[in-house]
């Protein structure tokens, strides 16, 4: 029996040629996510079964994407970016509402969120633009990249979904960062730093006064003093912090968390699922979660840096840093260190669209490692 299973695994590996170590880490984290999801739903298997279906579909997407050569992604980048922008415009014109925002596009046979696609499309497009010539890039490709990022960010912010807009914008900026791009407005380094700081302050001022709407401003202000509105805008943060703090070293045990079982923790199966983990598994559970995340991030960076072409290195490194950003933002959000922006915890939170996007990202990283041989880059 063991020999039969081993042979099947060997055939599977030879056919797909994926990175086994990364897959093992992903499955470990997914298993932990299912356990916490079971607990957050009050010991019900309903959400667990549905998440298992999502995981199966998302894993299939990862395996398919892992077979796509990076060269095909690079050549398809302009079409993908144009298609993504068109879909974002269609969302603003004909999109359906959900959760107070116009984010979904309903085609009758399928309902999806185009902004989820842009989490992958933007890094692919920017990496394609910047990798056409030697690095660090010259001014023209950088300007084109910034314009493309700005268009996508503004269209998503208009839905409104500022959290997703900023994170997608960051995914494009990460590609610029890894390309070695440096902002040099003037020769004097101190004057250059002052000008950059002035531009950033001006952008923040403009965003606060002309881009952010009232509830988004309230979320930011609540961050500094959640006790000022404990039953309103500060409720999420306060209940989450109580749950995290009450977990102690070893936690209260699976399905034994008082904050989660009594429904004090909001969105405990999605955005605030980390609060459930911290309350029921304590500091040890947090270290376990952080350790698996660290292994995944290290492995993804390791696979990306082994690549022999600029496009693959830029794309792999930026997608890995996007994963880190989502982890950091979610944990910071539920801990009261960052505003509540509705970001799921990767491979732990319940959800289908975000999971598909994440697994597709893993598929891309596996693909650039699989096709790192020079013969794929011609």
Regions found by a protein language model. Give the residues of each.
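A juxtamembrane structural motif centered on a specific transmembrane helix
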Residues: 1-10, 329-378
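N-terminal membrane topogenic signal
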Residues: 7-26
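Hydrophobic alpha-helical transmembrane segments of multi-pass inner membrane proteins, especially
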Residues: 23-31, 35-233, 275-335, 360, ...
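Transmembrane helix boundary and interhelical junction motifs in multipass membrane proteins
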Residues: 161-166, 252-257, 268-270, 287, ...
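Long extracytoplasmic/lumenal interhelical loops at the membrane interface
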Residues: 244, 248-284, 311
